[in-house]
Curated annotation (Swiss-Prot):
<comment type="pathway">
    <text>Amino-acid degradation; L-arginine degradation via ADI pathway; carbamoyl phosphate from L-arginine: step 1/2.</text>
</comment>
<comment type="similarity">
    <text>Belongs to the arginine deiminase family.</text>
</comment>
<dbReference type="GO" id="GO:0019547">
    <property type="term" value="P:arginine catabolic process to ornithine"/>
</dbReference>
<dbReference type="InterPro" id="IPR003876">
    <property type="entry name" value="Arg_deiminase"/>
</dbReference>
<dbReference type="GO" id="GO:0016990">
    <property type="term" value="F:arginine deiminase activity"/>
</dbReference>
<feature type="active site" description="Amidino-cysteine intermediate">
    <location>
        <position position="392"/>
    </location>
</feature>
<dbReference type="Pfam" id="PF02274">
    <property type="entry name" value="ADI"/>
</dbReference>
<dbReference type="GO" id="GO:0005737">
    <property type="term" value="C:cytoplasm"/>
</dbReference>
<keyword id="KW-0056">Arginine metabolism</keyword>
<dbReference type="GO" id="GO:0019546">
    <property type="term" value="P:arginine deiminase pathway"/>
</dbReference>
<keyword id="KW-0963">Cytoplasm</keyword>
<keyword id="KW-0378">Hydrolase</keyword>
<protein>
    <recommendedName>
        <fullName>Arginine deiminase</fullName>
        <ecNumber>3.5.3.6</ecNumber>
    </recommendedName>
</protein>
Length: 402
């Protein structure tokens, strides 16, 4: 098999390479006191979550997809580059919170760790109790006053949702700014990987300013050159606008649709209510089909032009098709809301007309199958406690172009 060219220009081109993160020690940091702050709706059974994720990864491999695990990429980058170690430590150690004396001691300790151990700390965090025994307590008021179980480095339990912290658009990768404090440092790890891992040598960036929040779950590649960006709880209007201008400047898109969505937990990203399942077909939460609008942003000779229309109409026009087909799940309103909450609309396309979905959303899956979509199901009773489905848990690095 030859070297796969990295890049994606659609949601449904045959998936060749994907980044996943097998949940690990970072989930063990969740407890009843911090679960809300760390953006989970419950305490997952970690061993079962790992089993479910292994099933997901194996399904992708069985379909010819190369699965890259984020923890492996991080360890390899830290092994390959001393600069990567410096970058990772600098992003993890916050002198403003820890004070200069403790920050200096902690940084020196982390830089001396073996790559695999450092990678683990960068992902799972560290408590004050886990500091080395010879850490000087006499010079740090912060160390003396903190409870031993407090985090000196916060864990990153949402790493499993690799979709959000890097976005491939064409041959370039976007390392976005994540909106919430619990997730901000995730992007520092993907930034490190793309900067220092040999697999990504020469990969160019898009949206390099990263000044306003954009998250990958809000970004849908509707067709080559056409990008939809959800604007709601996570991605801001300023982020959508800045991303659009960056994509225009780099000739990565000719049209960007900014799609307002409700600012609520159940609809945190655009891909929680709408994903593509074929080149001209979406599955969409029934309660938003008629309500979604879009601001079409296009580059013109005189600058940038913005117009507003219903989302489905704007999308079809931008894609150059008569109509964007919406699979009617036809569900009872209560069942529709239940299955949307359980990520029933958050499917991952492996190729046109073939998707991965959580098995628990039986009614949505049945309607997809009746519409001619092949649905490959995985368990998600524990993975779903962080409110994310197969699309959320995957970052496509290479798809066949459409």
């Amino acid at each position: 098999m030859g070297v796969v060219e990295l890049g994606t220009n659609s949601e449904v081109g045959a998936l060749r390479v994907v980044i996943l993160h097998r949940p690990g020690g970072e989930l063990l940091r969740l407890n009843p006191r911090n679960v809300d702050q760390l953006l989970f709706d419950g305490l997952p059974w970690v061993a079962r979550a790992q089993e479910e994720h292994d099933q997901f990864a194996e399904l992708l491999r069985s379909r010819g997809v190369e699965v890259l695990l984020l923890s492996d990429l991080l360890t390899e980058a830290l092994t390959h580059s001393g600069a990567a170690r410096m970058q990772g430590v600098a992003a993890a150690v916050d002198a403003r919170r820890l004070g200069v004396p403790l920050a200096q001691e902690l940084s020196a300790y982390l830089r001396g760790l073996e790559p695999a151990r450092l990678a683990q700390v960068l992902m799972a965090g560290m408590t004050f109790n886990e500091l080395p025994a010879d850490t000087r307590t006499d010079v740090s008021l912060v160390l003396r006053m903190h409870h031993g179980g407090d985090f000196v480095i916060d864990p990153l339990p949402n790493l499993v949702f690799t979709r959000d912290s890097s976005i491939w658009i064409g041959p370039r990768v976007v390392i976005p700014t994540l909106a919430l404090r619990a997730r901000v440092r995730e992007a520092s790890l993907t930034d490190l990987i793309y900067a220092h891992h040999p697999r990504f040598t020469g990969v160019r960036r898009a949206y390099e300013s990263r000044t306003a929040p954009v998250e990958g779950g809000d970004v849908l590649l509707l067709a080559p050159g056409v990008v939809a960006v959800g604007v709601g709880e996570r991605t801001t209007p300023a982020g959508a606008e800045a991303l659009a201008r960056s994509l225009f400047d780099d000739d990565l898109a000719h049209t960007v649709l900014a799609v307002p969505i409700a600012q609520r937990r159940a609809q945190m990203h655009l891909d929680t209510v709408c994903t593509m399942v074929d080149t001209d077909t979406v599955v969409m939460y029934a309660n938003v089909v008629d309500a979604l609008s879009a601001f079409t942003i296009q580059r013109t000779p005189s600058g940038v032009e913005i117009s507003e229309a219903p989302f489905l109409e704007a999308a079809a026009t931008a894609m150059g098709i008569d109509k964007l087909r919406v699979i009617d799940t036809g569900l009872d309103p209560v069942i529709a809301e239940r299955e949307q909450w359980d990520d029933g609309n958050n499917t991952l396309a492996l190729s046109p007309g073939v998707v991965v979905a959580y098995e628990r959303n039986a009614q949505t899956n049945m309607r997809l199958q009746e519409a001619g979509i092949e649905v490959l199901t995985i368990a998600g009773s524990e993975l779903g406690t962080g409110r994310g489905g197969p699309r959320c848990m995957s970052c496509p690095v290479a798809r066949d172009p459409l």
